[in-house]
Amino acid sequence: MNARVALQLSGIERHYGEGDTFLPILKGADLTLRSGETVALVAPSGTGKSTLLHIAGLLEHPDEGEVLVNGTSCNGLSDDRRTAIRRNEIGFVYQFHHLLPEFSALENIMMPQLIAGLPKAEAAERASALLDYMRIGHRGSHRPTELSGGEQQRVAIARAVANAPLILLADEPTGNLDPETAGYVFEALEALARQSGLAALIATHNHELASLMDRRVTIEDGKVVELK
């Protein structure tokens, strides 16, 4: 694959606690994601799955190792610079949607675009197009509490890619949904990632859904291991 490297994690180590409470989570984890590639992270709870995603998304610092986003080393960067890279290059989807309850679905998707400085009319147009792509264009004026769980998560996915990030990270994005809804949301997420040409790392417990991805990896003894 000749696509450019969007995200590279090298020798990532992360532990919590000190002394008697010392708990190593990641022990020299390596992972490379290329543009247009979808990768499923299939690992049990407690193995460091969320920690790896948080480090990849610049939400957490590793104790050792290097994180490169689009070729830029994020080690030693100021918090402001890390925040700028995260906003411009990375979209994040959580198991729980974290939508702003006082705003409509359309406004929630517009929000990151407005923060990035996009004119309101352009932000609204892109938000509307994303809602249409996720097949919930007719729900744009509804607030999160008026949406089903699947609809809420589709809005969250649209919000995550609103600024056309290079990388999409998702931590159990369908874990709180029924199997049928989870399947549709996961397929929509995977299709959106492919169409946008971004690099996607999606954590899931569901091996059937993970099989839709280009690659599957897991975490064993603190290291990222490729699954066949």
Curated annotation (Swiss-Prot):
Keywords: ATP-binding, Cell inner membrane, Cell membrane, Membrane, Nucleotide-binding, Translocase, Transport. It is an enzyme of class 7 (translocase). One of its GO terms (molecular function) is transmembrane transporter activity. It is found in: Cell inner membrane. Pfam families: ABC_tran. SMART domains: AAA. InterPro entries: AAA+_ATPase, ABC_transporter-like_ATP-bd, ABC_transporter-like_CS, ABC_transpr_LolD-like, MacB-like_ATP-bd, P-loop_NTPase. Belongs to the ABC transporter superfamily. Lipoprotein translocase (TC 3.A.1.125) family. This is Lipoprotein-releasing system ATP-binding protein LolD. It comes from Rhizobium meliloti (strain 1021) (Ensifer meliloti).
